[in-house]
């Protein structure tokens, strides 16, 4: 019986039987054991008989029969001879499919180095032998000898000898020593290595050495050697003596008509290897001259190289049509390789595609499926039904019936389709809502009908888009489709938790029109008893839709018991709103309907319905809203006519005023008062302002009309202009587009982003002249080209994000950490950009939240903050909350539900098994295509806002200055001399209300701690130039300011005023390159002045382009500008906007000129300067002084004697996330990346929850560098997963040993993906060759933890519905381990009990087979 079970188990060789995949080097014996025979001839197929040649590349004796159960000569045919080996042709009688799995081998006449281990950097063979790659190649390709056995000579092992040196040595020492060429030599060297001894030696060296580079090199080698020792791989296996041959069906040869063959490139490559190998064997037998043999060996090496990785070394071997042949390496890498083409994405059966059209009559869970398609897709189901009903006796008969499309077939199709969901998918599938399930409704025609409300999720429109249909076959699949993927279960967007089923376009316009008010409409002032009567009045023509009336409205409010209480009030409303109220579900307040509904308000309606009444009601409500919207949009009769674009009368005076201003600036420029750059900036500012004014005038004109009310007096009301209504409701178009239709087109951008200073004053209604048209095409075309390129970039970003985050899954409920992030509202300028509520909604509190000013606990820790609790926070005006975050989660592999918080798409705490990593990646990647390459473009129109130049406060409160340094000028105002000063206004309770960044050189009228009133202007500055502010009073002394060398003097002909302009270093003559133009301040006697309370000279270096309007010796007072530096013009500012910025952040790239941060806290001083750098010293209270060399042109924010904190900015620039992590820790870097990424998305109006970005940050931070290893398994300086270190530290703590010390490291997403523990995942991402080489040498094991690895080996993923399956497998594995530990005797005892008869056995077998079926 036991053997029987074993036999059955052996039969079911499924993918279930392994839990880990190991990759390693194959030894020659291993390759021979895989092989079914040696391939000796290069022949493939006999061209006449089409039979494979014996011993050739397709030999049937080695690889198996060509036809099922038939030997080659035809002696044995049929199943009864199964397993017989024919004595004539030597072919085993079995199935043909063995030709897909049986391998052969080639015995190489001379060893050959494996190119992957040789050329893949860093070269593994080179690292192992500690030799440079060039030297190894010289030996391998027979240019030099290498000493393999020095014997008693004074040669060294591994020394290279040229031909002459070798001959000399042979003369001197005869056969005392051994030196060889080619792969044999390398093989001998590798064989002779004692790995353990070498490891010991390196460890000692590591202890002794002090140099960093040496240390790195030794660590690298040591790691490789240890990997070899641990994995049991032998170094000499990197040189092959036996070459495996791929099974023939994986490199097919197909006869085409006309006697030609289509062949896989691999066959050519193998043929080449076999030919050269056979020729070499023959030469060796003939004992040919050395030089000929050598040449043949080199050619063999080259041909094997080409087979393994063509083009890796030298020129690629090409086929007949000059195309490089596709080698084994090419078969697995790249988008068309095995991993990405066949393992990660497969084409599936039971699918179809067609064009989509609107189905406005459908319910949200339905879609229209053309009958023809349905018949084809559901074929097997129809056959089964036809047979079981007895309409057809065989499948063949059923097939005929379906082909004839008999009447009964349609009835059965309708029955089969009932409640059988299908999946619709629109490419590109950017997030999980790109595939949703619907119930099909059979329709005539050939187009799929789609519900309009799901278009937003699919990003579909009906201009010819196509969609694919898939049929879930098994019961489980249907269940998943219905429970998880049904469109009605995907009302909320996983990216931000807002409804994604929101009406747009027609529906919005219809509802907006319906809920508008009109002064003095027909029937105004009527009293109506209920909405039904209102509808009656409208239908009979007694009242207009927009008339203001009084209606009795009955609202239903949920009471404590969960039942509805009715409440009726007489409400001032309009007919339309009363009619709309009829579709409102019970439990909604009328106030939400009693307003003019725009797109935002409608979205809020659906959101409220979902939150108050649950999913079902919300979905039904959304459907009703859609039907109503369509109906009333049709009744509104809105259309666009040319007269709707009303041009404001003021337009022409505004434009002529602007033209006058421009002319004035031009005069100033000609008279030398302003520089060219300043003139350009000011002109652009003037036109931008003019454009704004025209737009304002136009909107005022469009948006209001004057009417006579019932009393006969004129009154203003919102206009019923069609274009205005479309934009105002949010249905289509925007103010910016109407501006171009009826205002002026405004400033246009050139393709490089700079702005053309002559605007287009015409609009589309007036029409453009030729020049204006030409200017506008210039920028607009760039937009189109950008869009095409952008899509690819966006897709690639998504791919990298998914790859880095794919194995992050919710694995437990609570990790128990008290850590978290502190959330505060984001305030920019005078307004709250993001309120606290939005930041904490759906998060879990990390600590008890206390009532401000009291010790009372409002909300205990570990509570999920939902809408109600957020109301509590608002009511108590809490302004900072510490919430749990995935970045601080303590779970080892995965995250816990409490740290993640709410599942945004479902509205409750997230379930275990949810793949949060993939969701995060999709949420960030999906809007990627909307992020423009350059920041703003509206049809190429540039919107250069007039730059800010002052701070005007909006709230009364107290001024607070952060990081501020200033001097007081003689008007007793403050002049800032610090660079990142932040100014905040706080109210009486100390809550921040406004937040501004104030630049260097700004003049403040109020200081720290002073009161201000709303509307007061407290700071102003020149937006176009940056001053150099004098911090002491004194007299100007020029240093290195030499006319013609470092500066040019510009004198104005008209005014006679002269100014000095400093030249850029690049423009100067050689003599002036090293000079540093500086303004020094001296006292009346010419002595140096020091800055107050320091010993730093009052001297100011002038950067290039700075303009000095003072003369040598002029007197200056404190706070006066010494020089001004023109700021870069608008539009050409080098802000990487949009997608590239997001990519840079996630790749953790270092900016060009990064900010310099203080490495330690202490007092700043300056040491001895070198030619181009200054030496900055920071002296801490105790410990070593830190010093850093800083280039002189960097402007410093610190002065001598100043106290800095670790992580403070010393010199401005873009901050590097790596520095932030090192100096300020994990939380700071998380905050930095989240805020920076959010800035980009907010600018485009895209809402993404912070959680998703944090998930990616967690994955970027998952590696650590060991700083102190003690006696653990790690090496110092080694990069390890943080989770691994934590696990080891827990064990060490239990044993009472000191914990391993480590520093967190931030990796860019690409690097992090490649550094993952799973080699399968990394190999299928990028750089396949390098990853596989590294993994094989180290003998890596893949635990199949992530999603990708499991997809590749064809299993359910360990997330979602596959999560439980994997947990069960894990349990079974533990049970099996326990069972295996039962002693052998028990097993023998058990076996005795199993004495049974044949009948018993067969009965038992039947039972077992049934059980197996059930299990499946």
From Swiss-Prot:
Coiled coil regions in record: none
Cofactor field: Mg(2+); Zn(2+)
EC number, as in UniProt: 2.7.7.6
Species name: Haemophilus influenzae (strain 86-028NP)
Binding locations of Mg(2+): 461, 463, 465
Gene: rpoC
Cofactor binding annotation: Binds 1 Mg(2+) ion per subunit. Binds 2 Zn(2+) ions per subunit.
Binding positions (Zn(2+) 1): 71, 73, 86, 89
Subunit structure: The RNAP catalytic core consists of 2 alpha, 1 beta, 1 beta' and 1 omega subunit. When a sigma factor is associated with the core the holoenzyme is formed, which can initiate transcription.
The name this protein goes by in its record: DNA-directed RNA polymerase subunit beta'
Keyword field: DNA-directed RNA polymerase, Magnesium, Metal-binding, Nucleotidyltransferase, Transcription, Transferase, Zinc
Keyword rRNA processing: no
One Gene Ontology molecular-function label: DNA binding
Biological role: DNA-dependent RNA polymerase catalyzes the transcription of DNA into RNA using the four ribonucleoside triphosphates as substrates.
Pfam family name, one: RNA_pol_Rpb1_3
CDD domains, alphabetized: RNAP_beta'_C, RNAP_beta'_N
